Structure formats: C-alpha cells, structure tokens
Amino acid sequence: MISENNLLPLNDTEHFLKNFLKKFPVYQTKIINPLANEQDYIYLLHLLEAEWHKQLPDQTFFLTGSSGHLSEDFFIPENQNVCILKNLRYMPLLMHSHQFIEINYVLKSNHSLLIDAEKSTPLQDGDIILCPPNLQHTFQTQNKNSIIVDFILRVTTFDTVFFHLLNNNNYLSTLFSNVIYGDSNGYIIWHCQNDSALKELVLKVYEEWENNLKYCDKMIELLVMEFILILMRSHEDEAVFSTSYINNSDENFRSLLNYMQMHYQTVTLSKLALAFNYSERQIIRIFKKNTGKGFSELLTEIRMNKAIQLLKNKDIPINGIASMLGYSSTYYFIKVEQSYV
C-alpha cells in the first residue's frame, strides 16, 4: 500500500503555483473572495492563466471551467459518484463554494489553515473536515510537506448511498444533517490524530483511485462508507461544529436531542419531560440556552431533515410521508414543509 511519503512530491500544477506565489508574493496572504470583490477575483484568474500559458503552454489551464461556485462535474468524472484528490498546495487563497459534499483528511498539516467567512482554523495531522455545499472557504497549504486528501461526493450519491448511515438517530447524525441539509453555513471538524485505521483507509482510498482498477468506483464508495462508519462509531464526541450552538452544548441537551431523534414521530414536550424527569420549563430553558430555539422548532427541523430524503422517493405518497414523520394531517405537513423550504 502507498504511504503518505508517496503523496509528498509536487505535481506540475503545484510547481507552477509555488513559482506563482514567489513571483506575486501578495497572494501568499491576500484572501480573494468573489462575493466581496469580484474584480479582484477576475484579475487573479486572468493573472494565473497568463502565467500558466507562459510556463506550461502545452497544458490546459488547470482552472478552465471553474468559478466561485464549483459544480460537481468540475471534479467528478461522468458516470462516477466520488472523486479522490490531493488538495493543491501553494494555491492562492481563493474563497469558493461548491455544489458537492467534500470530506478532507489532513495527512500532514505543517501549519495548514482552513479559512471560512468567519475565521482561520489551524489544522492538525489527522483532522477531518466535512465541508457542505455552499460553504465559502479555502485552504492555506503553502508548504511542500502539507498533505490533505479530499473526498468529493455528489449530493445525490450521499443521499442514496451514505445517508442511511445517518439514520441511527444519534448526536452525530444530527450534526451531519444540520451541516449538509440545513442552513447552518458551517462545517464539522474532528481531531483524530491517533486513529491509524482512518489514516490507512484514506491511503487505501487514494491508492484505489490512482490505480483505477476494475470496479474501483464501487470499491471507493464502500471504503468511504467504512470511513464514515468508523468516524461515527469512534469519534462522535470529538465532532466540533464550526458555527452552531451544538458546539457549546451540554450533555443534558445532547441526551434530549438524541431522544428526539429516536422518537421524532411521537415525541411531545410533555413526553420528553416525563422521560427525563424534568419539568417542561426546565427543558425549554435547556433548549433556549443551547440553541436559542424552542422544542417545536427543533422538532420541526428534525422532521424536515428526514422529509428532504423521503420526498426524493417517488414511490412514497405524500400522506405516507406525513404519517412516517408523525403528522396526522397531510395538509398540515405540506404547510409546514413549504414554510420550512
């Protein structure tokens, strides 16, 4: 099996980018956000392309077809569901979002940073980041010894292949659902420095992608599924949500939230209070303290996150979905679903 040292050599694009930053050092630290200043973004792209054609005239410009919001097809080959990449080192700090789901594994950090709209987060060896669609972010990896491996997943693939893994009704399932399907505009990060199983899986996935053997796409899906399962089983308590209330939640809140995930069809405030021997007022205070939201709003979020998936199955009638989610009235479910969207 390949080792992390096999991933250290710079490729042609990284050599180009390293030279570019030497020639234009302002872009070593300047963050370019197309949403804030489109002219700066366009200027940098033109500058990169001009320098590329000078240095690599026989190669297609590596950002051809790119934009500030990257489509799934920019990276993922047609008829495939997952793409495995090595994050480009020496890339200028171009803020971007994307249509797909991205899972990053930090093999070697060497002072790498994850930059989003709010802050810069130092990364450590073994860190795992779940970047959802539409999150504005970039990575600062201006070091030849930095290695970050990217899993790029189509959203439809995550829905059909991976989402059933998250129906375990636990705290981490809630995190995944909020990040990917909610409006949190945040990411999840795990610090998993000592998990050799995850590291070996990442290297195995990368090797499978590079070798491109028969059925490699299906093998990669299975390996990524195993990766997510280990993450959920072994590192639930290490998940940090970048911007959400969940980051600062207490154990009482986690227990209440888990219970609601398990019993979302039938749970009421009075039943929740009885199950935990709290008064209804105590539960309301816990929810307000940790989320700023009430019981009904949280329950609606849980139900609507599940509704998003059920509505994609055309074989289930609307009244059936309403019943599965705990709504006795199909009309009321439709009203709630439309207002939530």
Label the predicted regions.
Residues 189-192, 210-220, 229-262, 271, ...:
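Short, Lys/Arg-enriched, Trp-marked, Pro/Gly-tolerant hinge/linker segments that flank
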Residues 126, 282-287, 332-333, 337:
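Short hydrophobic/aromatic patch on the recognition helix
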Residues 77-173:
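N-terminal regulatory/effector-sensing and dimerization cores
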Residues 2-22, 27, 42, 49, ...:
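A hydrophobic/aromatic-rich effector-binding and dimerization subdomain
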Residues 257-262, 266, 270-271, 278, ...:
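Terminal helix-turn-helix DNA-binding modules in bacterial transcription factors
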